[in-house]
From Swiss-Prot:
Residue positions, PTM N6-carboxylysine: 134
Family: Belongs to the IlvD/Edd family.
Membrane listed as a keyword: no
Gene: ilvD
Protein origin, superkingdom: Bacteria
Lineage, top ranks: Bacteria, Pseudomonadati, Pseudomonadota, Betaproteobacteria, Burkholderiales
Assembly and oligomerization: Homodimer.
One GO process term, biological-process aspect: isoleucine biosynthetic process
Binding site for Mg(2+): 91, 133-134, 456
Designated name of the protein: Dihydroxy-acid dehydratase
Residues that coordinate or bind [2Fe-2S] cluster: 59, 132, 204
Catalytic reaction(s) noted: (2R)-2,3-dihydroxy-3-methylbutanoate = 3-methyl-2-oxobutanoate + H2O; (2R,3R)-2,3-dihydroxy-3-methylpentanoate = (S)-3-methyl-2-oxopentanoate + H2O
Keyword Thylakoid carried by entry: no
Length: 568
């Protein structure tokens, strides 16, 4: 008997047809003809390519070849590539200056650019190419807001530099500044380290923020397997960009969208991988924002829940030995994920951009890491039994604060507060030898509203490490830390000082306790005295009254909510 059922096939240009089909769209099509389109192109999908190429930073200066490869892949697969630009800020270059306050702002600008171009131009899909830290969360947030089929192409990691038999990376230079100030490193060696630390294109080489977020994107399933740990100069990175474009065309055909992929279970997978690889504290802030863009319930306490059951399996910088290129050679993120999956710590049923489940993607990955490498540990021989990114609470951070707690020789410190209302004066105090072992530095008015923009504190923390104080001095801030930071440091303190959080009421010499075991951040001052200080406190005047910084300060939510601008 004949099957009388009919199958409706959705056109692959289902969105762009709004501006390319019908007589009334003749003026619209004339604009395309001006760019070399022919009549047959209007039945093909219009595929955006958000190109983050920039000569501002080595993180992004190698992206054009990836964009070109993606364009080629789109066209070979039957699509029309439409390229538009997205900006970047170099965190490494802006670090320690007023420019660093624009870093987190750029996350929002990037997401706005992508949402605006994709939605305004009725694009059928988008491929995002990015490199530096905020390119990743900004890109994915824009993809999720627009919610058309999309894939992320990470620009790739940088190769290590070398000097006197030692491997170098960008954090080596920040720490060398502290060593030089402490008289432990000559001016000549400082200059040589400066020149040799970054030998070419790519993002900073350890499990810092860019590599953390790219690894997490692979774990989400929004990027291709193995792509997150490839080096930018290598041909496989370019080939991966082209392959990503072809996968995207299939996703457009199947109408597989980012919000189908970035679910609560997928975010749990990503956070488990962040914990297992020893990733950046910034991932906490960014995944709160990503979940918000995806419409997924996710709180700061969810990170602590995942942390407590996930071991650290990878020995990676900043606190470990190895770089992302070493992780790639050892089996990459798929090897880490397979170990977690077999241990029941991943959701194998999550869908990926290829249309496969994560379990299917990992099917042929070995059950145990290779014996000839030391980067990835077996699940029964972890580096640490629990994850490293802990959420600390107490009267200094009732909404939470973020700390890296693994590998600390002194997980508890109680000491006198050394209070600074800006980063530069704190850095100068370290370089001048005014900070002593046992002190607890308090850097405040550096949160989302107070900074504004929640700048990273790599210059002070790097100087502490270089001066030999990384294990003996505590540092807390309502700002952020670079992915390259390690030591007894606590960031993202919420509520922030500018919002009247307790951190605003700390006085020089007050006793503060950081207890990584009890997950406690406490001002050891009587509640009655804190209440008196609160009653006398007035919010400082806004540091910016015009432009993007003023808009960010006015609209930003608490760090405990991701410092997003649309939490209305």
């Amino acid at each position: 008997m004949a099957d009388n059922k009919t199958t409706t096939i959705e056109p692959i240009n289902r969105r762009s047809a709004n501006i390319t089909q019908g007589k009334s769209r003749a003026p619209n099509r004339s604009m395309y003809y001006a760019m070399g389109y022919v009549e047959g192109d209007f039945v093909k999908p219009m595929v955006g390519v958000a190109n983050g190429h920039s000569t501002i930073t080595p993180c992004n200066s190698g992206l054009q070849k990836l964009t070109d490869a993606a364009i080629e892949g789109i066209e070979e697969a039957g699509g029309n590539a439409q390229v538009f630009g997205t900006p970047t800020i170099s965190d490494g270059m802006a670090m320690g200056t007023e420019g660093m306050k624009y870093s987190l702002v750029s996350r929002e600008v990037i997401s706005d650019c992508i949402e605006t171009c994709v939605s305004g131009q009725w694009l059928d899909g988008v491929l995002v190419v990015g490199g530096c830290d905020k390119n990743m969360p900004g890109g994915l947030m824009g993809m999720l807001r627009a919610n058309v089929p999309a894939i992320y192409v990470y620009g790739g990691t940088i190769l290590p530099g070398h000097y006197q038999g030692r491997e170098l990376n960008i954090v080596s230079v920040f720490e060398a500044v502290g060593e030089n100030a402490a008289g432990k490193l000559s001016d000549h060696d400082l200059r040589e380290i400066e020149k040799r630390a970054i030998p070419g294109t790519g993002s900073c080489g350890g499990m810092y923020t860019a590599n953390t977020m790219s690894s997490a994107f692979e774990a989400l399933g929004i990027s291709l397997p193995y792509s997150s740990t490839m080096a930018n100069p290598h041909d496989e990175k370019t080939n991966s960009a082209k392959a990503s474009a072809k996968v995207l065309i299939e996703a457009i055909r199947n109408d597989l969208k980012p919000r189908d992929i970035v679910t609560r279970k997928a975010i749990e997978n990503a956070v488990a991988v962040i914990m297992a690889t020893g990733g950046s504290t910034n991932a906490v802030l960014h995944f709160l924002a990503i979940a918000h863009a995806a419409g997924v319930p996710w709180s700061i306490d969810d990170f602590e829940r995942v942390r407590q059951k996930t071991p650290v399996l990878c020995d990676l910088k900043p606190s470990g030995k190895y770089l992302a290129v070493d992780l790639h050679r050892a089996g990459g993120i798929p090897q880490v994920m397979k170990l977690l999956l077999n241990a029941g710590l991943l959701h194998g049923d999550c869908i990926t951009i290829e249309g496969k489940t994560m379990a299917q993607v990992l099917k042929d990955v070995p059950d145990r890491p290779r014996a000839d490498q030391n980067v990835i540990r077996p699940i029964d021989q972890p580096l640490y039994a629990q994850g490293h990114l802990a959420i600390l609470k107490g009267n200094l951070s009732p909404e939470g604060a973020v700390a890296k707690i693994t590998g600390l020789k002194n997980p508890v410190i109680t000491g006198p507060a050394r209070v600074f209302d800006d980063e530069q004066s704190a850095l100068q105090a370290i370089l001048d030898g005014k900070i002593q072992a046992g002190d607890v530095m308090v850097l405040r008015y550096l949160g989302p509203k107070g900074g504004p923009g929640m700048p990273e504190m790599l210059a002070p923390t790097g100087a502490l490490i270089g001066a030999g104080l990384g294990e003996s001095v505590g540092l807390i801030t309502d700002g952020r830390f670079s992915g390259g930071t390690w030591g007894m440091v606590v960031g993202h303190v919420a509520p922030e000082a500018a919002a009247g959080g307790t951190i605003a009421f700390v006085h020089e010499g007050d006793s503060i306790t950081i207890d990584a075991r009890q997950l406690l951040l406490q001002l050891n001052v009587a509640e009655a005295e804190i209440a008196r200080r609160r009653a006398r406190w007035t919010a400082p005047a806004a540091r910016y009254t015009r432009g993007v910084q003023a808009k960010f300060a006015f609209n930003a939510s608490s760090a405990s909510q991701g410092a997003v601008l649309d939490a209305y």
